[in-house]
């Protein structure tokens, strides 16, 4: 693999048994710090889910150590080359589950999961009739980018997906169901849950959107927008053939791919907005959030009460 940039971002997961997640997390954090990696890794009894960044040498050492651990035999690393770190710190945290579905009867992907489709097969399947493409990510991820024709479930987070499926059973019954997510981890469980619910033809995009975008054959075709990632990059390109912007500015509806968090820490909603609108609307998604005494934009820019009042007046006048 020809390396052109000094840093790498690794994205990976594996469903495998980790007997003591708390102990493993503490030891793994120490190991990652010794390599000077930065990132976010979740550990549970059911496995590991991580993204981390470091130099080529640091990431090579990390991958070698993981590959030499029998628990992670066969682990696949998705690699992006970057100019610098994608994280500020290193976190390794134990969790009850790797992805938050909170099912009463959990799914073990080693026992039940949907069919794996490689990018080319997924591409062909998307073009077939009687196919339903379900985005298994959060709403703000979909809004930044998605496959053409994909359904956006009316949910805010992944754990709400099973309820949405049950509510829309009549629409989905008898259809070929395709599911996809960023790297594949959410679909391992979600597709398994669909199979358990009685859906007969369920497939998942093997390796997720990230793998699809790197595939030399499909080159990300049929994807619109960008792919949301959980690090400081926020978004990465997928479609190598054309770039269609699907994101819309929260305030004006104009094409936009720039995410910020609402300045009210009690809200913290992710909103797409231009730099101009961020300043105009004090980076707040609503009037209620703009007038919050804890508005981070106001604090960060040391705005006076008069300046805030003038900004609010300008917004009101523009309605």
UniProtKB/Swiss-Prot annotation:
Q: What class of enzyme is it?
A: oxidoreductase
Keywords associated with the record: Oxidoreductase, tRNA processing
* Residue ranges annotated for the Rhodanese domain, each copy included: 127-221
SMART domains cross-referenced by the UniProt entry: RHOD
The cross-references to PANTHER family, in alphabetical order and at most eight, read: RHODANESE-LIKE DOMAIN-CONTAINING PROTEIN 7-RELATED (PTHR43268:SF3), THIOSULFATE SULFURTRANSFERASE/RHODANESE-LIKE DOMAIN-CONTAINING PROTEIN 2 (PTHR43268)
Family of this protein: Belongs to the TrhO family.
Protein name per Swiss-Prot or TrEMBL: tRNA uridine(34) hydroxylase
Name its species. Bacillus cereus (strain G9842)
């Amino acid at each position: 693999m020809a390396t052109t940039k000094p840093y790498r971002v690794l994205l990976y997961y594996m469903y495998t048994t980790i007997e003591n997640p708390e102990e493993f997390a503490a030891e793994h954090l120490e190991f990652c710090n010794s390599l000077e990696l930065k990132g976010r890794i979740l550990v549970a009894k059911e496995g590991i889910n991580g993204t981390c960044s470091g130099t080529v040498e640091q990431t090579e050492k990390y991958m070698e150590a993981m590959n030499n651990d029998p628990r992670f035999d066969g682990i696949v690393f998705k690699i992006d080359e970057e100019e610098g770190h994608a994280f500020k710190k290193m976190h390794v945290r134990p969790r009850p589950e790797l992805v938050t579905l909170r099912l009463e009867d959990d799914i073990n992907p080693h026992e039940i999961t949907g069919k794996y489709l490689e990018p080319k097969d997924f591409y062909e399947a998307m073009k077939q009739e009687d196919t339903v493409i379900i985005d298994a990510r959060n709403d703000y991820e979909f809004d930044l980018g998605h496959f053409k024709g994909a359904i956006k479930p009316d949910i805010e987070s992944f754990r709400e997906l099973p309820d949405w499926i049950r509510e829309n059973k009549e629409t989905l019954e008898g259809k070929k169901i395709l599911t996809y997510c960023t790297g594949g981890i959410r679909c391992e469980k979600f597709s398994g849950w669909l199979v358990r619910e009685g859906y007969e033809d369920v497939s998942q995009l093997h390796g997720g959107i990230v793998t699809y975008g790197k595939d030399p054959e499909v080159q990300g075709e049929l994807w619109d927008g960008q792919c949301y990632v959980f690090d400081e990059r926020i978004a990465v390109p997928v479609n190598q053939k054309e770039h269609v912007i699907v994101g819309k500015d929260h305030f004006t509806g104009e094409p936009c791919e720039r995410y910020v968090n609402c300045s009210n820490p009690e809200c913290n909603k992710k909103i797409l907005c231009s730099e101009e609108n961020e300043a105009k609307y004090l980076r707040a998604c609503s009037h209620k959030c703009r007038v919050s005494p804890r508005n981070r934009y106001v604090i960060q820019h040391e705005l006076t009460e008069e300046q805030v009042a003038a900004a609010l007046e300008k917004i009101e006048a523009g309605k």
